[in-house]
From Swiss-Prot:
Lineage: Eukaryota, Metazoa, Chordata, Craniata, Vertebrata
GO cellular component: a single term: perinuclear region of cytoplasm
Entry comment on modification after translation: Ubiquitinated by mib, leading to its endocytosis and subsequent degradation.
GO molecular function list: calcium ion binding; identical protein binding; Notch binding; PDZ domain binding
Cytoplasmic face of the membrane: 533-664
Annotated CDD domains: EGF_CA
Positions of glycan attachment: 173
UniProt cross-references to SUPFAM superfamilies, sorted A to Z: EGF/Laminin, Growth factor receptor domain
UniProt protein name: Delta-like protein C
Organism: Danio rerio
Segments on the Extracellular face: 21-511
GO terms, biological process: arterial endothelial cell differentiation; blood vessel morphogenesis; dorsal aorta development; hematopoietic progenitor cell differentiation; hematopoietic stem cell differentiation; negative regulation of Notch signaling pathway; neuron development; Notch signaling pathway
C-alpha cells in the first residue's frame, strides 16, 4: 500500500514540475485628467483595464491578450489612489519580457463595457522587462488629457519559485518526503533524511551499508546473517559454541576445539588451565588431562599443599616449622644442621670438609664457609642440583656446576620442560580433519572419505563395510549404506527376510457381473453358430441324396437292345470314343415338364441323334483339355409324358482321368 501511495505522490510531483503559477499585479497610484474627459458629469466614474501580450516590436492593442487581462473596480475619478488594484494570474513559465497595455475607460453604466471606443480616456502600450520580484516598480504615463502614475510587479504563487515560477516546492514531513524549501525552491532535507525527495533515512553512523538498513533516522537494522550494533558481525551457525565466522552461518573452531559445533575440547589444559600452584598440565585425550605437581603439593589439580613436618624431619629434639615448599628445624643446644642431626663442635676439631673454612661463633659453635660446589653444615655434601628433579616430563638434568640445565624430551619445551609443544598449531590435518594434540605428535580424526595421518588420502567408505548377499554399497554423509536385494535386510544385508504372504485382493462386484454376462453372451453365440452349421449340413446332405437317388434310378434301368429306340437313347448317356462313363457323382438329373401332347417317335429319335452328335462334337474338342474345367450342357428334350426317361444335365467339375464302372 505504501508503495502505491509513493507512486501516486511521484506522479503528483511530476505534474507540478510541469506546471507554473504566478500573478502580475498593478496598482494605480493616481490618475488626473482634464474636465472635458467626463463630459460635465458631476460624478465621473472610470475603470482601468490591463492587457498582457507576448513581446511585439509593434504593439497592437487589439485582442487577444495572449498572457491574460484584468480590470479594476469602477472608481470615482477624483478619488483614485492605491485602491485601484488589478491582478492578472498566469499558469505558464513567466517569459520575462511582455507587452503591457493599460487602458482608462469612462464607465457610463455599472457595466464595465469596452465595446465603445469613444469611452476610452487613455491608453498606454509599452514593452517591459519584468523579473520575478517582491518589489514594486513605479512608472508614470503622461497623455494628452491625463496623467497616470502606477506601480507593478510579478510574483509567484505559494510553493512556486524560480525566475519563471516553474519550480514547485511545498514543505512536508510525511511518508512522501521530509523537507523544507528555500527561497529558490530547492528542497532542504530535514535532519536525518536524504535523497531527491528526502525519503531515504540516514542510518546510524557506521552502520554497514551492505549488511544493514534503516527505516527511520538513526536506526541500524541487520539483514539475515549479520548482527551487532553496526551489523558488521556475521552470525555464527546455530549451536556453535567455541567457534568464529567470516561469513554468515559459519562455525570455524578456535584453537583446542573441534567438532561440527566446536563443542569438543581437544586441548583441555589450554582452555581451562586446571592445574594449580604452577603445576605442569598434560593433555591425555579428549577432555582429559594430568597435572604434574611441584614439591609440596598434591591432588588431581595439585590443589592440596603438603605439610613437610608430617614426616618429622628434625632430629635430636628439634622442632619443625612448616613453610611454603620447605621447613626449618629449631635445634636444641649442642645441635645444628638442617635436621639438627649434627652435634656441636669447635673449629679446633676441623669439622669443615672439602676445603671449607671454619668460623667460630660466640655461642661456642662454628660455621663452615663452603667452596663452590659443596654444601652442608660441614661442607660435606657436594651440591647436586639435579637431585630435586627439576626437569619435568622426563627431561634430563645436566649439572653444570653453578647451575643445572634440562634437556627436554621431544615434544616438550621450557626451562624445566614443563610445556607440551602444541603439534596442532600448524593445522596439519587436511580436508576438514580434526587435530588432537599428543606428546611429540598429533592424531587426525578424518572426515568421511579421507584417511591417512594427515587425512590427505581419499578412501572409499564402502571398503570398510562390505555388503553381503549381493547388496550394493553407497557412500552417505553419515557413512556407508547398503541397499539390500529382495529378501534380505540389515546394515550389511546379513539377515534373511521372511516372505510376506500376499493376500489376493477381492475382485470388485462389477467385474464379476461383467464377466458373467460376457460368458453367457459368448455361450449363446456359440450355440447359435452350431445350430446354423447343422442346418446347412442337413440341407446339403438332403440335396446330395436326392441327386444320387435320381442317378441310381436311371442307371439301374433294364438293359435294352442297341437297335431299339430305347437302346439308342441309353447310349446317349455314354461318352463316345472312349472307355469312360458318366458316373452318378458327375451327373445331376433334373426333371422337366414333358409336353402333354404326344410326338411321334421319329421326332423323338431325331432329337436323340442330335443330342448324340452334340456330345461327340463336344467330347472331341475337349480331348486336348483333360485337366481343365468344362461344362457340357445337354439341352432339355421333350419326352413323352408317359416316357420312362428324363433329361440329364452335367454339373461343371474338374475332370480327372478315372475309370467309372456302373452296373446296369
Amino acid at each position: 500500500m505504501a508503495r502505491v501511495l509513493l507512486t501516486c505522490f511521484f506522479i503528483l510531483i511530476s505534474s507540478h514540475l510541469g506546471k507554473s503559477s504566478g500573478v502580475f499585479e498593478l496598482k494605480v497610484l493616481s490618475f488626473t485628467s482634464t474636465s472635458s474627459v467626463c463630459k460635465g458629469s458631476s460624478d465621473c466614474q472610470i475603470f482601468f483595464r490591463v492587457c498582457l501580450k507576448h513581446s511585439q516590436a509593434l504593439i497592437l492593442p487589439e485582442p487577444p491578450c495572449t498572457y491574460g487581462t484584468g480590470m479594476s473596480e469602477i472608481l470615482s475619478a477624483d478619488s483614485i489612489s492605491s485602491s485601484a488594484y488589478i491582478s492578472v494570474p498566469f499558469n505558464f513559465k513567466w517569459p520575462g519580457i511582455v507587452s503591457l497595455i493599460i487602458e482608462t475607460w469612462n464607465a457610463e453604466t455599472s457595466d464595465q463595457s469596452t465595446e465603445n471606443n469613444n469611452n476610452m480616456i487613455s491608453r498606454l502600450a509599452t514593452k517591459r522587462r519584468l523579473a520575478i520580484s517582491e518589489d514594486w516598480s513605479q512608472d508614470v504615463h503622461l497623455g494628452r488629457q491625463s496623467q497616470l502614475r502606477f506601480s507593478y510587479r510579478v510574483v509567484c504563487d505559494e510553493f512556486y519559485h524560480g525566475e519563471e515560477c516553474s519550480d514547485f516546492c511545498r514543505p512536508r514531513n510525511d511518508t512522501f518526503g521530509h523537507f523544507n524549501c528555500d527561497a529558490a525552491g530547492n528542497r532542504i532535507c530535514l535532519p536525518g533524511w536524504k535523497g531527491d525527495y528526502c525519503t531515504e533515512p540516514i542510518c546510524l553512523s557506521g552502520c554497514s551499508e551492505e549488511n544493514g538498513y534503516c527505516e527511520a533516522p538513526g536506526e541500524c537494522k541487520c539483514r539475515i546473517g549479520w548482527e551487532g550494533p553496526l551489523c558488521d558481525e556475521c552470525t555464527r551457525h546455530p549451536g556453535c559454541l567455541h567457534g568464529t565466522c567470516n561469513q554468515p552461518f559459519q562455525c570455524t573452531c578456535k584453537e583446542g576445539w573441534g567438532g561440527l559445533f566446536c563443542n569438543e575440547d581437544l586441548n583441555f589444559c589450554t582452555n581451562h588451565k586446571p592445574c594449580r600452584n604452577d603445576a605442569t598440565c598434560t593433555n591425555t585425550g579428549q577432555g582429559s588431562y594430568t597435572c604434574i605437581c611441584k614439591p609440596g603439593f598434591s591432588g588431581k589439580n595439585c590443589e592440596i599443599e603438603t605439610n613437610e613436618c608430617d614426616s618429622n624431619p628434625c632430629k635430636n629434639g628439634g622442632s619443625c616449622n612448616d613453610q611454603e615448599n620447605d621447613y626449618t628445624c629449631t635445634c636444641p643446644q649442642g645441635f645444628y644442621g638442617k635436621n639438627c642431626e649434627v652435634s656441636a663442635m669447635t673449629c679446633a676439631d676441623g669439622p669443615c670438609f672439602n676445603g671449607g673454612t671454619c668460623m667460630e661463633k660466640g655461642s661456642g659453635s662454628y660455621s663452615c664457609r663452603c667452596p663452590p660446589g659443596y654444601m652442608g653444615s660441614n661442607c660435606e655434601k657436594k651440591i647436586d642440583r639435579c637431585s630435586s628433579d627439576p626437569c619435568a616430563n622426563g627431561g634430563q638434568c645436566l649439572d653444570l656446576g653453578n647451575k643445572a640445565t634440562c634437556r627436554c624430551r621431544p615434544g616438550f619445551t621450557g626451562s624445566r620442560c614443563e610445556t607440551n609443544i602444541d603439534d596442532c598449531s600448524s593445522n596439519p590435518c587436511q580436508n576438514a580433519g580434526t587435530c588432537v594434540d599428543g606428546i611429540n605428535g598429533y592424531t587426525c580424526t578424518c572426515t568421511l572419505g579421507f584417511s591417512g595421518k594427515d587425512c590427505r588420502v581419499r578412501s572409499d567408505a564402502c571398503s570398510f563395510m562390505p555388503c553381503q548377499n549381493g547388496g550394493t554399497c553407497y557412500t552417505h554423509f553419515s557413512g556407508p549404506v547398503c541397499q539390500c536385494p529382495a529378501g534380505f535386510m540389515g546394515t550389511q544385508c546379513e539377515y534373511k527376510q521372511k516372505p510376506t504372504p500376499v493376500n489376493s485382493p477381492a475382485l470388485p462386484a462389477a467385474l464379476i457381473v461383467s464377466f458373467t454376462l460376457g460368458l453367457i453372451t459368448l455361450t449363446l453365440v456359440i450355440c447359435a453358430a452350431i445350430v446354423v452349421l447343422r442346418q446347412m449340413r442337413q440341407n446339403h446332405k438332403a440335396s446330395s441324396t436326392t441327386v444320387r437317388n435320381n442317378l441310381d434310378s436311371v442307371n439301374n434301368r433294364i438293359s435294352l437292345s442297341p437297335t431299339s429306340p430305347l437302346g439308342r437313347e441309353k447310349e446317349a448317356f455314354l461318352i463316345p470314343g472312349g472307355p469312360f462313363k458318366v458316373s452318378n457323382k458327375d451327373m445331376a438329373l433334373r426333371s422337366t415338364s414333358v409336353d402333354t401332347h404326344s410326338s411321334d417317335k421319329s421326332n423323338y429319335k431325331q432329337k436323340m441323334v442330335d443330342y448324340n452328335l452334340s456330345i461327340d462334337e463336344k467330347h472331341t474338342n475337349n480331348k486336348l483339355e483333360k485337366n481343365s474345367e468344362s461344362t457340357l450342357l445337354v439341352p432339355p428334350l421333350n419326352y413323352p409324358k408317359e416316357g420312362v426317361y428324363h433329361p440329364v444335365y452335367i454339373i461343371p467339375e474338374h475332370i480327372e482321368q478315372r475309370v467309372f464302372a456302373t452296373e446296369v
